[in-house]
Amino acid sequence: YAFFFRYTPGLDKNMIGDYLGDPSHFNIEVLREFTDTFKFSGMVLDIALRSYLETFRLPGEAQKIQRILEAFSERFYDEQSSDVFVSKDAVFILCYSVIMLNTDQHNPQVKKKMTEEEFIRNNRAINGGQDLPREYLSELFHSISNKAITLFGQSGVSVEMNPSKWIEL
């Protein structure tokens, strides 16, 4: 299932995200195998997160988002050769923070946008009690502020998989 979800064009990205976030043991194994198809070595967090989240849409349920981000964080952390992060937990916390920043910066209903200083302050001591490098957080802030990560069912692709599409596979 993992390779099918990852490499089959035209599948409904909302359905993939919903499936990957499901709490059943089998679905969690598929999520791990799906996540293991990504190579994150040498990537900055936002680039890796963008490449991951372009293959499906995050479901709206908090527990499903948590499971998906936990799988991503573990894979991202395991693939890093730098010593920026002390644990996968630091990656996980920063992922949530980046998603909140993305929503804050790109949702027109948010009137007062988060500043760079607020983003850096919000992420104090998340790295095993230590701060992440200020430059790293600053680059993340500007990257997200300048270009949104597509989340929660937003899609530029209108082609969805339906029975008539199976012949094209």
Please annotate each region the language model reported.
Residues Y1-R75, D83, F92-L94, L101-L169:
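Catalytic and GAP-homology cores of small GTPase regulators
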Residues Q80-S87:
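Eukaryotic intrinsically disordered and solvent-exposed regulatory patches
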